[in-house]
From Swiss-Prot:
PROSITE patterns (alphabetical): RIBOSOMAL_S6
Tagged with keyword Membrane: no
Swiss-Prot/TrEMBL GO biological process terms: translation
Gene Ontology CC: one annotated term: cytosolic small ribosomal subunit
NCBIfam families the record matches: S6
Annotated Pfam families: Ribosomal_S6
Keywords: Ribonucleoprotein, Ribosomal protein, RNA-binding, rRNA-binding
Endpoints of the signal sequence: none
Gene3D superfamilies: 3.30.70.60
InterPro entries (UniProt xref): Ribosomal_bS6, Ribosomal_bS6_CS, Ribosomal_bS6_sf, Ribosomal_S6_plastid/chlpt, Transl_elong_EF1B/ribsomal_bS6
The protein, known as: Small ribosomal subunit protein bS6
Length: 113
């Protein structure tokens, strides 16, 4: 099995469907004997440039360990799911389990308040 980092952006008007979408992808990964090392919901964030006349998107980050055929299933679903604006799947050398810098920054801001 290989390690992957996946980031996908969801249409901001569909933020209420995020938990269902995450459960769907968790099920695909678990049904294919995969392991989820990290799952982060970054929430709604400003886009660097507009995509389909949108200025914001809901970001989800996953670090998983799966067989390549599972990545093919996920890529196909990302491609044909019209609420997903963009996605990026990167192969990584090892599992990343610590918090991402974006989530660390959010936690630091909450602690200061």
């Amino acid at each position: 099995m290989r390690h992957y980092e996946i980031i996908f952006m969801v249409h901001p008007d569909q933020s209420d469907k995020i938990p269902l979408l995450i459960e769907k992808y968790k099920k695909i990964i678990n049904d294919n004997n995969g392991i989820i090392h990290r799952l982060e919901d970054w929430g709604r964030r400003q886009l660097s440039y507009s995509i389909n006349k949108l200025q914001k998107a809901h970001y989800i980050l996953m670090n998983i360990e799966v067989f390549p055929k599972t990545i093919t299933l996920l890529e196909t679903d990302f491609r044909f799911n019209n609420i997903i604006l963009r996605n990026m799947i990167m192969s990584v050398k090892k599992a990343i389990v610590e918090l991402s810098p974006i989530l660390k920054l959010k936690d630091d801001k909450k602690e200061k308040k």
